[in-house]
Every structure is written in C-alpha cells, then in structure tokens.
Amino acid sequence: MMFLLPFLTVFLAKQSHTRTHSLRYFRLAISDPGPGVPEFISVGYVDSHPITTYDSVTRQKEPRAPWMAENLAPDHWERYTQLLRGWQRTFQTELRHLQRHYNHSGLHTYQRMIGCELLEDGSTTGFLQYAYDGQDFIVFDKDTLSWLAMDNVAHITKRAWEANLHELQYQKNWLEEECIAWLKRFLEYGSDALERTEHPVVRTTRKETFPGITTLFCRAHGFYPPEISMIWKKNGEEIVQEVDYGGVLPSGDGTYQMWVSVDLDPQTKDIYSCHVEHCGLQMVLEAPQESGNTLLVANTISGTIILIIVLAGVGALIWRRRSREPKEVMYQPTQVNEGSSPS
C-alpha cells in the first residue's frame, strides 16, 4: 500500500461527544403578499432541524419534528397557537408603522429572530434582532440592556423600547435562562436525531474547465451535523483567494453537502491538497495529478473511525488514531424573538 502515500494523508482526532447546539425562532411579516403567500410566518429550529411552524393561513402552531409531537401535550400547541395569533397582529402592526416612517408602500418584509446557543464548553449565548427588507434594523444587547439602532427610523423604535426597563430585563432573562432550558429539553426529546454523527464522503477531482485552466474540486456529502471546515492548500499553505465555495446545503436525506474548488495551471508542479474537518475527524486528500478522482469514505465503528480509500479503482483500508483534540470548526448562527416560551 506504499504507493498510496503520495496521494493522501489521513489524520484521526479523538472524537468529541459534545457539540454546539442552538434554538432559534424566526418571524416574517409581508406587507403585500401574492396569492397563496402567508402574511405572517413563524418557524422554530433546533440546530438545522425545523421543530415548529405557524402561518396566517393555517393559524395553528404545529410540530415539524415527530419527537416534538410525541413529547408536548395538545394543550401546549393550543396555548401557543393563541399567543401566535396575537403576535401576528402585533408584528403586522409594527410593519405598517415602519412603512409609514420610511414612506414605503407595496411589498416589504419585517423579520425577527431570537434564540440561544449551548456551546461545547457549557457556556451559552443569546441573540435577538430585527430586519426590514432583509437589512439589519435593530439588535438587542442583553449585557447592556439596550438596543443598537441601524438607521434613523430604528432610533425611534430604540427610544420606545428602551423606555420599558421591565421588558428589557424580561428579554435578557428569556435569552439566558428560559431559552437554554427549552433547548436542553428539546435536545433530550430529539437526542437520536440531534446527537448523531455521520461523517462525510469526500472526493477530489481534477478537470479542464477552460483551455489552459484546470480546476480542482473537493466535494463532501452525506455528513451531519452541518458544521464542517473545507480548505485547499498549495504546498502546505492555505489558499485564501481564488477559491470558490459552495454553501453547506441539505441533501434531502437528513445529511448535508458542500464543495470547494480552485483553479491552477495544468503545467504546475505544485502540490494541492484538500483539508476537511468534521466532528473531530480530519482528512487530507492530495489532488490527483491527472484527470480522475480520489474518494474517501469515513465510517464510525465501535468508536474507531475506519477510513476506506478508493483510488483509481484500488481499495485500501487504513486506520490511525491521534490523541490531539480537534480544532474548532466553523459555525454561523442566525437570530429571532419569541416571548416567554418556545413558539
């Protein structure tokens, strides 16, 4: 198997059994929706999993995950259905006020995001912000009990909301305490789905995209959770510019996919390698020197990661442990506001 060594190197880091989790609620109001488009929508997520939904057409809060339906009684859904109907009226009124202040008519949107995160080290974060027509409008700072306004109209809202000290403290408490309590409860309800790990299948390919231009592609698919790091290196140095990234996208089967590519001169003697990190698993695949691909499949068996490498039709089984802890992988949250309990 020595002939494989120039093509790839595989590192295994000790697997971590903790990860960052988030609970987020989103609201959206639309001032002039078209036929069949709700005027108001509210959706809840744990990590990337939708858990609740409500809209102005159904006017019912409903579960989006089976483990939510199984663990929350019917009176929970009825109680928050009534609350959401009230929040719908309030949210649509706020949108009309903003349109008057901006002197706008026609189609406009108003969004709200609230949520919290439980980090790997046990610490927590909370976030609450609003957007108008997709642009940041006002953001809550729970540490200073104040609002950060993004324009002159937002300053009007800031003055009104900061006059209510009780509400400011209430939002802080919800973000720091109640939101985290609900998140922990939901993680318990959906542990089988939310705590699982599926490592990616990673493939590097080389193809001529234009005359004189060769593109290297590194593709990962079939992984969960969606947090992943993928970079290209040239002669051991990370390539920062001239790299194209595809976003982390759902595959439709509960897993995710992503790609990253880089162009090169086909006559170059430089060595290019794709570096992938996912839940403590670190993989380095050297790009093929000729048209073709390198495929790496990672599976977990009894706590030991087995890597099956298929290169040019030849299969090899390689495994190796490393005691080094994994680096932090990338994660980008978003945000919403939902009252004293999940909605």
UniProtKB/Swiss-Prot annotation:
Residues 106-197 are annotated as: Alpha-2. Residues 200-302 form the Ig-like C1-type domain. Residues 19-105 are annotated as: Alpha-1. It is a single-pass type I membrane protein. Residues 320-343 are cytoplasmic. 8-(9H-purin-6-yl)-2-oxa-8-azabicyclo[3.3.1]nona-3,6-diene-4,6-dicarbaldehyde binds at Y25, R27, K61, H76, R112. The alpha-1 domain is a structural part of antigen-binding cleft. The alpha-2 domain is a structural part of antigen-binding cleft. This is Major histocompatibility complex class I-related protein 1. It comes from Rattus norvegicus (Rat).
